[in-house]
């Protein structure tokens, strides 16, 4: 870590969370070395979630153009250019956005990337890149959010499909694809529940993960990055309510999610440290992160192989689970037919 980087936080102003000094919110200790979180995405995601939990701040994965934004790539690209402040001053957000190769229909990508970085990664950057201590820092490069987009968390392409509407919601004539900005209201196995503002009208809808079309699929069968409008009837509302509740929590047969190699290493080391130092649990994450960074390539491969096998196990069990559901749904459909 260069000495130039370490001096940057001193340029920022202290952000007071309350008038009383006792209520000033302060930065925690780094959860891992910056070099480690840059090289290992699993360490990055683990420490980022823990960081937001410690800071009691909201954490979510933004969606741009119908795809989840890779915050690890965003963090790497911004920090290797000197951090948030430097990217803003040197106007390099368009350059950062070019790494993601957003679709041609995605607009305001630089604006959205900057906003998400400020909300989700700025304080994480201060702690892990610049090793900031004490009260929270506020960037000098002030972010002026457009009032019309200050609460928006997703950039999606809206393609009005040919669907059946109630009399109160007639289909629009001459509809075509265009880009709109909206908010993510919830997430489920197949996609996201979103809210999109089109002019003065606000539409609720479902943003599905686009599937790969088969040979027999018609052009209208797959709507990439499409927001499907819906009318909230009582029956529809109940069905969506069930989807919002995680199937993982409800169904005991749902396969156990896979863990990365670092997760296995973390669990192993955490167990050992807890038995040796039961009163120093707050320091374990940092110690384990340093231990992981000190492993040789061969030693690290042992855990990464375990993680790869666990990923294969999860994918195999997930395919079996989905096949079981498909057969069960098919049996139920056939039973209703008779």
UniProtKB/Swiss-Prot annotation:
Question: Per its UniProt record, what Gene3D superfamilies does this chain match?
Answer: ARID DNA-binding domain, High mobility group box domain
Q: Which domain of life is it from?
A: Eukaryota
Which spans does this entry mark as compositional bias, Basic residues? Answer: 235-247
GO process terms (BP): karyogamy; polar nucleus fusion; regulation of DNA-templated transcription
Primary subcellular site in the record, as a coarse category:
nucleus
* Annotated region described as Disordered, given as residue ranges: 233-259
The signal peptide annotation in the UniProt record is: none
Q: Which residues form the ARID domain?
A: 38-129
Any GO MF annotation of the entry: DNA binding
- Keywords assigned: Developmental protein, DNA-binding, Karyogamy, Nucleus, Transcription, Transcription regulation
What does the UniProt entry report for the null mutant?
Failure of fusion of the polar nuclei during megagametogenesis.
Annotated function = Binds preferentially DNA with A/T-rich content. Required for karyogamy during female gametophyte development, when the two polar nuclei fuse to form the diploid central cell nucleus.
Q: What is this protein called?
A: High mobility group B protein 9
Say which species the protein is native to: Arabidopsis thaliana
